[in-house]
């Protein structure tokens, strides 16, 4: 619904003049006037936050067993208030994305591959399949405002990692 409303309410007259088919059809690109159609694109935000969260759960809940899933869930629900020791342990003792750690790199590959195949398996209301990407330039800040605490120790409301970069 959001995608359809976006195309109906926000035409791109200038961009449309640059694309094949809009003159001939007399339609804006958002009205289907272009000769070649791709997308729309779903741009992923927070991929390294996802990877680090999964790595934290795998490492601390399943491998080292130094945190129970119940305790982690409670800490997340409370934004780590009263769980600062756990938060510090998660942040400082979890293998993180971007550090050339094979098991984390494999996890990143598996998750991005899964997301890619899931996204392209769906068609938009305009017909073409969705395309995916991991290159948001600035959405990590506003998206972070609405994301709760994460298992690697990130507190609620703070910025997510930029694009597909590791946290810094």
Features from the language model and the residues they span:
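Acidic, glycine-enriched catalytic cores built around paired aspartates
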Residues: 1-168
């Amino acid at each position: 619904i959001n995608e359809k409303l976006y195309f109906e309410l926000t035409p791109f007259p200038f961009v449309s003049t640059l694309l094949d088919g809009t003159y001939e059809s007399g339609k804006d690109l958002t009205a289907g006037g272009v000769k070649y159609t791709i997308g729309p694109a779903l741009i992923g935000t927070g991929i390294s936050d996802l990877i680090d969260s999964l790595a934290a759960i795998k490492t601390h809940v399943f491998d080292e067993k130094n945190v129970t899933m119940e305790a982690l869930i409670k800490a997340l629900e409370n934004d780590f208030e009263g769980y600062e020791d756990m938060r510090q342990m998660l942040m400082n003792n979890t293998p993180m994305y971007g550090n050339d750690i094979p098991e984390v790199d494999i996890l990143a590959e598996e998750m991005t591959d899964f997301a890619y195949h899931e996204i392209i398996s769906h068609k938009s209301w305009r017909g073409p399949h969705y395309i995916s990407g991991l290159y948001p330039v600035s959405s990590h800040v506003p998206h972070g405002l609405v994301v709760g605490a994460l298992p690697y120790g990130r507190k609620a409301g703070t910025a997510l990692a930029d694009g597909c970069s590791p946290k810094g």
